[in-house]
């Protein structure tokens, strides 16, 4: 027995390592066939036997019954292999009817529709004709000149019937050859001489300058090369013989009423056979040409319908006007072969039922109803009954089980012991949606689930159902126990935080238990023993909330027990007793009212320091304690617990006064409608927050009462603050005010709902709020699908990302630093580098001690060292820079978040990344409607405050002092840094153009001091010189318009789009500043003082007035506010991963230099950047309506925005490189999720980005056979270049290209994976022509061909098989 077979699968499947797809030649089709199908008949409707030579013929396809010929002469096994001389049927198993094929010899050649119609059409590309022309030839509309002979006609020219006749008259019958139909196309394809054609095309490509022609030639050349490499013949795209599928795969079944249900394929095949037979007869009887031609066309159409119904012309329909399901439809889409049967199979040994809560279960257990267990474990029970001699045969055992005899239950108990079962809750959005448990037999019909795993399954008990699956083989049981047991899945793979965390009532119980109240009975007593305390509690000398002192034994760092006196309560000590003893887990972590966050932190600590077993026991005990006290605390709430603050009326009155003022300003024309709208929204947002804060303060206060029985703390407050249920958002609506509502388009209605639910809403308010609620409901319905689709695309693009080796030994890495926005640290450095590996040796900046060596994992203890060293940026390894030839190496990936240690080889990190990004998306779309449409938008940021006591440093400081002696920022990229005493950066903020600076360089500031302020709703245009205003190119009604506000009647001048007027095209509205002599003033940068005004700018000055430095001459209103929620977010995530161009995208400066405005061109503005060194400048043409954020003479850096908006990802890649592109995508995606409080580790997003950057575009082919403009896999490109260098040729040059995830999935190296994703026919057509080989490296293709996936345990089996094969070769 060879070593290979030792590791082979048990079934006798063929051993293969790769799969190749090709175009089938007619000879191949005939060799597959077991006979020709001549008749269109299926079965005889009287005898129900298949007709001879028909579509179900037993002679061709095999016997209908096992080991029995059709006429019944030969029966049973003994005659196996004999062919009956009477009916011609071979005596064998009927299973062969699933694999034996037939064929139809076509009377006329027929084009394969995939190669004709699947874009780009391969036949037309090869023949260099348009697809329309080829169709005209194939469908007998036009003739084509094959050989011009003596005429002046061109080869390949099309002629209609009349034109042909004229040409014949003109040149004579035999002067030239013209023909029609598939025969002529086949002949033309046959005549192609590929080597010569390749040479010609290559030369033409070198000589042509036209870009369009180049593209066309590259496409054609690529196709010719594909044919040459794959050894396919082009004439095979036209078929002379048609394969017939095995009959069992297109069955004909009898229904109850004697009618038959048949597969559509039979109907389609019948049409082909009918037309083919008719055509044969017509040709034999020498029918007129026109009739034969018509029949040939009909045959072509019948074959088209069989292969891809509806691709060309009208689809063939059945009697009920439904289109027939063709072969292509069998493969395509969710119901196709790939996704329905190969990637998703129905599973035997499974059951499903409703779930109920099982609080008395241990974490590794689940309750399984006896009835279900009996059914699921039947085979095991049978064998045990037989083994113990309780039943003599399997049949007897079966009867015993059906009768439910008492012994059966005893055997079931034994069978079930330590046999894990898998529980799955749909939708399975991440890998924690399927976990293994040990079953406990229970009465009833519902499955019992442990409360702590609900978060992972996202399960609740309002009628959810779950499925049970039984792992049968010992290996499957082992894997279930080792990898999938609920006790082994404590941490979430998305972020490495514990996912087995108490929730809801457990949290409430623990919070209540750990509360401490003043003036409780027995305050200040001292205890040294828990039993003594229990005694005191029992006799009512203390309560669980009494503040007491207690002597507690604690482990110190050396591991010795030290007694410590702690101020605590009995309740907290009960939690303390559960803590495992470890010096790192101090009592202080639980010596406070425990909220959900605190409990999560403690569980995390226990896991990190005491391991998994201790964590599981601790979590289980916590749960029991929490439930007990949630029950005995008797927490509930009534109407009176919702407190409406007294200050509410005051705040509302104040805000209404404020709004009156805005209305007044608007009436006076000081602000536009948009500005007023924004200010009103802001005012109401602030008011709502104030009311909510006051309400919170009142709720948090203990009730003032002498009644000792009254609860000391408000129940609603307790639920919210502990994180058990409800958010402050919701409480605000119960007792504060509901606040602003959103319209269905995301806009905020500027009239708030002043009432809360306790007071009740007025009819008008109720109507207003219905709008938002409906939005929530609709969002949930519509967005769930798009989120699921995003997850599918992500899984598809990343499915072949597997950890294949320990270390790729690269020196590359990426630099990370903490993300600071608006002076606030949003993502601290520690969070970003935990669980990653160092790319270089890292030293302490002061003492120069080595903190981390290259390739070392950064764990919690190393983090502390890095933080104490004050390092603010670090080089870490990343999957983006990993240089493994296949897959990714463990060192570049870092920690496996689900285990907390270095990732192991064979881990399918791509799928985990996709699930981690996709799962919260689905969750968040469902979360919208819980808040009920209340607008969740904070007031706009209009100032920046110091977050520390620090020293100010200002970068790009360019300031003017205006007439009010205020410092106005004139720089577009001014940044304000706060430095500590060592000069390390503590915070930095961008200060927008036009802001008032309240501090200056070198000032010392204190925490919360205001540093700068600005108007968040407009972008001002400010003068830096004083002078007289002169309007230029402002033509009333063409480039500027007096807009009179309907509500106020006050006019203001607004710049409008002028390109629709003939004389407006040249206008460039601007304001110039003149000095006393009437000459134009020069600015400090040597340019004239002229300010170009974009469309939509509102003028703040009149023509001819005198203005001073720092005055606003115009303002550009910003968009009015809409709410921010994940709906805005999910499409944004999809946009980033699909690498789409954003709608109003920014333009990025590609070089450093000074800005100059050139001459406009039609409706575009010309922006020129002139480098400082005087080399050639770069021009950008931007639409006039866009807001240009730079002014003439500004200095811009590479990567700065010239126009507002989201930058195009491809531009970032081109200008700033891979590292900055990656950090931009990571930052943007994280911003969406962070807004919803969802934590995802950066490395997951990086894995997806790596997959988007797989391809390069050839810019120079060097000495290789690559073509310029060809897109090819990065690794393939490196391999080709290595070969070229070895052979002494010049290597090719290429640039990295970014592809969206859909495109990336479709261009993956595996055609099986791509075909099962989308556009199945296109992918298969392309693969067949190129004769592609699938190496079966990814997960998907292995699932499809029915093998173990090369990840996890399968990775090692794969490795062993390869080693074994090598040994076999050596031994041979």
Curated annotation (Swiss-Prot):
Protein name: DNA-directed RNA polymerase subunit beta'
Binding positions (Mg(2+)): 460, 462, 464
A matching Pfam family: RNA_pol_Rpb1_3
Protein's UniProt keywords contain Nucleotidyltransferase: yes
Keyword Transferase recorded: yes
Recorded family membership: Belongs to the RNA polymerase beta' chain family.
Cofactor(s) this protein requires: Mg(2+); Zn(2+)
Subunit structure: The RNAP catalytic core consists of 2 alpha, 1 beta, 1 beta' and 1 omega subunit. When a sigma factor is associated with the core the holoenzyme is formed, which can initiate transcription.
Species annotation: Rickettsia bellii (strain OSU 85-389)
GO cellular component, one term: DNA-directed RNA polymerase complex
BP GO annotations: DNA-templated transcription
One GO MF term: DNA-directed RNA polymerase activity
Catalysed reactions, as listed in the record: RNA(n) + a ribonucleoside 5'-triphosphate = RNA(n+1) + diphosphate
Job of this protein: DNA-dependent RNA polymerase catalyzes the transcription of DNA into RNA using the four ribonucleoside triphosphates as substrates.
């Amino acid at each position: 027995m060879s070593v290979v077979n030792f590791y082979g699968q048990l079934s006798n499947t063929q051993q293969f390592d790769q799969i190749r797809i090709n175009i089938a030649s007619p000879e191949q089709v005939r060799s597959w066939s077991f006979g020709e199908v001549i008749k269109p008949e299926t079965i005889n409707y009287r005898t129900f036997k298949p007709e001879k030579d028909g579509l179900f013929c037993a002679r061709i396809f095999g016997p209908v019954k096992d080991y029995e010929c059709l006429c019944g002469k030969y029966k049973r096994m003994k005659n196996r292999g004999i062919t009956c001389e009477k009916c011609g049927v071979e005596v064998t198993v009927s299973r062969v009817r699933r694999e034996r094929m037939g064929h139809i010899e076509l009377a006329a050649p027929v084009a394969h529709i995939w190669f004709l119609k699947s874009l780009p059409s391969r036949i037309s590309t090869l023949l260099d004709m348009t697809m329309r022309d080829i169709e005209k030839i194939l469908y007998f509309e036009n003739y084509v000149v094959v050989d011009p002979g003596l005429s002046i006609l061109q080869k390949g020219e099309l002629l209609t019937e009349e034109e042909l006749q004229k040409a014949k008259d003109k040149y004579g019958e035999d002067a030239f050859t013209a023909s029609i139909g598939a025969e002529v196309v086949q002949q033309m394809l046959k005549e192609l001489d590929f080597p010569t054609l390749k040479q010609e095309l290559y030369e033409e490509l070198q000589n042509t300058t036209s870009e369009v022609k180049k593209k066309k030639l590259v496409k054609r050349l690529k196709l010719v090369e594909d044919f040459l490499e794959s050894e396919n013949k082009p004439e095979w795209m036209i078929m002379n013989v048609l394969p017939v599928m095995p009959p069992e795969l297109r069955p004909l079944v009898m229904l109850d009423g004697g009618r038959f249900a048949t597969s559509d394929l039979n109907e389609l095949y019948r049409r082909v056979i009918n037309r083919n037979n008719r055509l044969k007869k017509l040709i034999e009887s020498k029918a007129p040409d026109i009739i034969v031609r018509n029949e040939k066309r009909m045959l072509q159409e019948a074959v088209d319908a069989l292969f891809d119904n509806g691709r060309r012309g009208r689809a063939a329909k059945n009697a009920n006007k439904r289109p027939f399901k063709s072969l292509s439809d069998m493969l395509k889409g969710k119901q196709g072969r790939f996704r329905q049967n190969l990637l998703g199979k129905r599973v035997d040994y499974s059951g499903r039922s409703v779930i109920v809560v099982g609080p008395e279960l241990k974490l590794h257990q689940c309750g399984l109803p006896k009835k279900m267990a009996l059914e699921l474990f039947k085979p095991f029970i049978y064998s045990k009954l037989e083994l113990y001699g309780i039943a003599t045969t399997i049949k007897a055992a079966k009867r015993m089980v059906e009768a439910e005899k008492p012994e059966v239950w005893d055997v079931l108990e034994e069978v079930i012991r330590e046999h894990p079962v898998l529980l799955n809750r749909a939708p399975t959005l991440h890998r924690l949606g399927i976990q293994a448990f040990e079953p406990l037999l229970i009465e009833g019909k519902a499955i019992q689930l442990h409360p702590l795993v609900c978060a992972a399954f996202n399960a609740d008990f309002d009628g959810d159902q779950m499925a049970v699956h039984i792992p049968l083989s010992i290996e499957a049981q082992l894997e279930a126990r080792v990898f999938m047991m609920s006790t082994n899945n404590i941490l979430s793979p998305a972020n490495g935080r514990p996912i087995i965390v108490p929730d809801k009532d457990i949290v409430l119980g623990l919070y209540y238990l750990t509360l401490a109240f003043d003036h409780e009975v027995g305050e200040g007593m001292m205890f040294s023993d828990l039993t003594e305390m229990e005694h005191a509690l029992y006799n009512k000398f203390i309560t669980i909330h009494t503040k007491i002192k207690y002597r507690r034994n604690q482990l110190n760092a050396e591991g010795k027990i030290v007694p410590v006196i702690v101020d605590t309560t009995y309740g907290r000590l009960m939690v303390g007793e559960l803590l495992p003893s470890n010096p790192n887990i101090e009592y202080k972590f639980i010596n406070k009212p425990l909220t959900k966050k605190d409990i999560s932190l403690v569980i995390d600590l226990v896991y990190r320091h005491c391991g998994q077993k201790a964590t599981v026991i601790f979590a289980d005990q916590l749960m029991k304690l929490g439930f007990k006290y949630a029950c005995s605390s008797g927490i509930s709430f009534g109407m009176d617990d919702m407190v409406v603050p007294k200050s509410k009326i005051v705040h509302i009155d104040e805000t209404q006064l404020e709004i009156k003022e805005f209305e007044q300003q608007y009436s006076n024309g000081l602000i536009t409608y948009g500005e007023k709208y924004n200010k009103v929204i802001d005012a109401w947002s602030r008011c709502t927050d104030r009311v909510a804060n006051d309400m919170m303060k009142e709720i948090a206060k203990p009730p003032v009462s002498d009644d000792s029985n009254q609860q000391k703390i408000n129940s609603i407050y307790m639920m919210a603050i502990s994180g058990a249920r409800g958010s402050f958002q919701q409480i605000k609506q119960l007792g504060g005010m509901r606040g602003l509502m959103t319209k269905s388009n995301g806009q905020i209605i500027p009239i708030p709902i002043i009432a809360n639910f306790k007071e009740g809403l007025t009819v008008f308010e109720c109507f207003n709020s219905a709008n938002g609620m409906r939005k929530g409901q609709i969002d949930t319905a519509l967005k769930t699908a798009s989120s699921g689709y995003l997850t599918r695309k992500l899984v598809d693009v990343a499915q072949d990302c597997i950890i294949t080796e320990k270390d790729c030994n690269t020196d590359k890495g990426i630099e990370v630093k903490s993300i600071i926005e608006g002076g606030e640290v949003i993502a601290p450095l520690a969070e970003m580098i935990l669980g990653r590996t160092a790319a270089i040796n890292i030293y302490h900046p002061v003492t120069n001690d080595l903190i981390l060596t290259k390739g070392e994992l950064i764990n919690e203890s190393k983090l502390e060292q890095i933080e104490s060293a004050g390092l603010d940026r670090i080089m870490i390894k990343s999957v983006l820079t990993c240089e493994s030839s296949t897959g990714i190496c463990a060192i570049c990936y870092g920690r496996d978040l689900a285990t907390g240690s270095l990732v192991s080889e064979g881990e399918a990190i791509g799928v985990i990344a996709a699930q981690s990004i996709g799962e919260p998306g689905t969750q968040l779309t469902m979360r919208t409607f819980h808040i009920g449409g209340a607008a969740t938008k904070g007031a706009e940021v209009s100032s920046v405050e110091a977050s520390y006591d620090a020293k100010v440093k200002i970068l790009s400081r360019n300031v003017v002092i205006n007439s009010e002696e205020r410092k106005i920022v004139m720089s577009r990229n001014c940044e304000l840094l706060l430095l500590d005493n060592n000069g390390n950066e503590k915070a930095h903020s961008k200060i927008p153009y036009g802001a008032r600076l309240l501090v200056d360089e070198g000032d010392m500031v204190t925490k919360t001091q205001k540093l700068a302020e600005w108007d968040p709703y407009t972008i001002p245009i400010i003068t830096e010189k004083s002078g007289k205003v002169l309007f230029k190119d402002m033509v009333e009604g063409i480039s500027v318009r007096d807009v009179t506000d309907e509500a106020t009647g006050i006019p203001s001048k607004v710049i409008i789009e002028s390109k629709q007027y003939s004389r407006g095209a040249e206008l460039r509205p601007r304001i110039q500043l003149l000095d006393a002599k009437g000459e134009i003033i020069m600015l400090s940068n040597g340019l004239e003082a002229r300010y170009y005004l974009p469309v939509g700018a509102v003028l703040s000055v009149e023509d001819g007035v005198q203005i001073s430095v720092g005055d606003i001459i115009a303002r550009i209103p910003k968009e009015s506010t809409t709410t921010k929620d994940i709906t805005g977010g999910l499409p944004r995530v999809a946009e980033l991963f699909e690498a789409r161009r954003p709608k109003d995208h920014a333009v990025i400066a590609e070089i450093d230099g000074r800005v100059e405005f050139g001459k406009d061109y039609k409706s575009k503005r010309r922006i020129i950047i002139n480098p400082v060194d005087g080399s050639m400048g770069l021009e950008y043409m931007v639409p006039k309506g866009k807001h240009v954020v730079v002014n003439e003479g500004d200095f811009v850096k590479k990567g700065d925005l010239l126009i507002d908006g989201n930058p195009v990802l491809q531009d970032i890649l081109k200008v700033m490189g891979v590292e900055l592109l990656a950090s931009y995508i990571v930052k943007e995606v994280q911003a969406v999720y962070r807004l919803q409080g969802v934590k995802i580790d950066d490395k997951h997003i990086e894995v997806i980005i790596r997959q988007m950057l797989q391809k390069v575009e050839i810019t120079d082919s060097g000495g290789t056979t690559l073509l310029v403009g060809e897109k090819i896999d990065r690794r393939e490109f490196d391999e080709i270049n290595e070969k070229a260098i070895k052979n002494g040729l010049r290597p090719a040059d290429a640039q990295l290209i970014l592809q969206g995830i859909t495109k990336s999935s479709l261009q993956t190296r595996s055609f099986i994976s791509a075909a099962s994703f989308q556009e199945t026919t296109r992918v298969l057509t392309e693969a067949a022509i190129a004769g592609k080989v699938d190496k079966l490296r990814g997960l998907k293709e292995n699932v499809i061909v029915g093998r173990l996936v090369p990840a996890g345990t399968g990775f090692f089996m794969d490795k062993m098989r390869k080693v074994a094969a090598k040994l076999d070769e050596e031994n041979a």
